[in-house]
Every structure is written in C-alpha cells, then in structure tokens.
C-alpha cells in the first residue's frame, strides 16, 4: 500500500485489514502507540508465495531418511510496517508485525508447480513426491524491529552501502 501518515483508525479500514489491525493491537498493544512529534509512516504489505524443498537425489522414489523431505508451503502473509525517525536519533526504525497463514503438503501444490516448470524448461522431474510431508496448516506470527543509520537528502550517485541492524521474534 502507499505510505499512510498519522494515527491509524482500524474502523476506517476495509474489514479484513481492520480485523488484522485489531489483532495486532491485541497481540502487541504497544505497536500502535503514539509517536508524538516523531515523523512516522505506515503501510501494509501483502505477500503470496510458494516454497518447495526436495532431497538432493531427484531420481529416488523411496523415502530418504537422512536427507531433506519433499515438502511444499503455499502461503499468504500480511505485514504492517511502521517507519519512525526519532527526532534526536541518528537512525530510522522500521517496526514490522506480520501474520502468515498457509498449507504444507499436497495442498500446497508444490509437486504440480515444480513439474510445470520442469516440463516447460525441459528439466528432469523429481520422482519422490509421493513421500512428501502430509497436509497440515501453517501459521507464523513475527515481530521485528530494524534500525538503519539515517542519512538525510537524496540518494547519491555511485556505489553505496547500508548497515541495518535488527532483532525479531517469530512464533509458529
């Protein structure tokens, strides 16, 4: 979404987004604290994705106990970002609260997706998908804070660098 300025009012948001904002307020009441005279902006990020994992040997059709299992994850994530530049500080801060829901196993359609790409590119297909992890729901909630040294002004031409410190808690 575009950056939003000022106080958040969940009742003014579309219902699913408003529910998510209320959930964040319940799970982490301090997230919506007033930033006072500190400049702050916020936005919502929606992620949809698929991850897949396979053992190293693509030709084996049996379960390989000492290798990574066949697994897929199909997920939808909502992340709320708040960017704050404390007045007296020499850094910017990004606070993120993210909720990810998904499915693991055949419901993730990882085998079908991988086979589609492998057929289209003429790559040998993996043969052991019958041994993938079973269907189950996936859930993750993340709280993260990132710090970046603040540099005022426009981007300078040429090479540059960034140092971003962070800490996070992920449950799920």
Regions inferred by a protein language model and the residue ranges of each:
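Outer-membrane pore/translocation modules
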Residues: 30-172
């Amino acid at each position: 979404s575009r950056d939003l300025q000022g106080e958040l009012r969940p009742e003014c948001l579309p219902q699913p987004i408003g529910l998510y904002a209320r959930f964040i307020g319940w799970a982490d009441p301090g997230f919506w604290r007033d930033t006072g005279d500190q400049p702050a902006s916020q936005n919502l990020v929606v992620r949809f994705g698929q991850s897949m994992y396979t053992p190293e040997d693509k030709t084996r059709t049996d379960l390989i106990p000492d290798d990574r299992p066949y697994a897929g994850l199909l997920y939808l994530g909502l992340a709320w970002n708040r960017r704050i530049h404390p007045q007296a500080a020499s850094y910017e801060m990004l606070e993120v609260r993210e909720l990810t829901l998904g499915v693991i196993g055949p419901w993730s359609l990882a085998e079908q997706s991988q086979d589609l790409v492998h057929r289209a590119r003429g790559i040998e297909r993996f043969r052991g998908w019958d041994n993938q992890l079973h269907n189950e729901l996936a859930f993750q909630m993340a709280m993260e804070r990132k710090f970046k040294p603040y540099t005022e002004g426009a981007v300078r031409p040429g090479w540059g660098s960034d140092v971003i410190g962070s800490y996070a808690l992920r449950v799920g």
